[in-house]
């Protein structure tokens, strides 16, 4: 009898163990099927996404700068979203360096003009000293110097146009990308985050554009003019006022960047935590208090959320890449102009100092400030997209 009890107990343990193994295998198969279903759903959803507006920006980049890229980095935006083609940072870095080299060579004519005008100014200045302040040489020197100033201001205006157009293009791209990104964020369980980001992003994007166009760029331009005027005479200097205006412009931009990042990061993180807790609570209640159907509903919801999260990360990463391309090429143009003026000042300084060399150095520094303003705005847009992408991932972590 006791032997029979031991045999019965052993049989029960074996059956229970086999049941656990079968159940574990079933769970593994269910998890694998769930992952495959989420991946298939993401591919099917990607095919129905409205990417026409974003695709226009991508096509513009391909049209203007596609000649610098290999064939592996060319193609439609949907090919990159579906995974048919992969984004290669190394190839794009090579393209950026090639474009920088091309811009420096293209500005070689400007460098030659600056060198010739500066040499003429130095020769005329020597003639003034030789002929005891001859009126003719003074007039000729003034004319050549004015031509140099006009050329410098024209280059400065071109740099401002490059930066302004790049900021406008980035703003338009963000406004086109945000609805798509927030829709995917909401479908992945981030309804509160999407409701928070939509008005805040729209307000801050438009405010940044107005700040750059109406305050920052005009102040930098006025500061450059005052600095150039200060080089014309030794008696009347306005360099302190020029420095003050420049500091106000950069300071206003830095303050706005701080406010922007503070609002986006702190409030965005709290909204993502709220989404995660809400989603977890709803899943627990549905799965435990509604028999059979509740568990099926939560599994289907997990599939949709996983697919939306996968698609959101893909679209977000491609959006960040396009944003970097929109900002990088104009920034290289601005940086090449600053390099040309700095190089001209460095080459010609051994011929003698004076207002001409100072003017070239002033223009170089002012163009660098334009580059800094463009870089700050680009960083602000880049971090805003990064926070939106991270908010969805944080929601899933909380769930």
UniProtKB/Swiss-Prot annotation:
Membrane topology (UniProt)? Multi-pass membrane protein
Report which residue ranges the record marks as coiled coil: none
Which superkingdom?
A: Bacteria
Q: Can the keyword rRNA-binding be found in this entry's annotation?
A: no
Keywords annotated in UniProt: Cell membrane, Membrane, Signal, Sporulation, Transmembrane, Transmembrane helix
Q: How does it assemble?
A: Interacts with SpoIIIJ and YqjG.
Q: What is the role of this chain?
A: Required during sporulation for activation of sigma factor SpoIIIG/SigG after engulfment is completed in the prespore. Overexpression in the absence of SpoIIIJ is synthetically lethal.
Q: What is this protein called?
A: Stage III sporulation protein AE
Which gene name does the record give? spoIIIAE
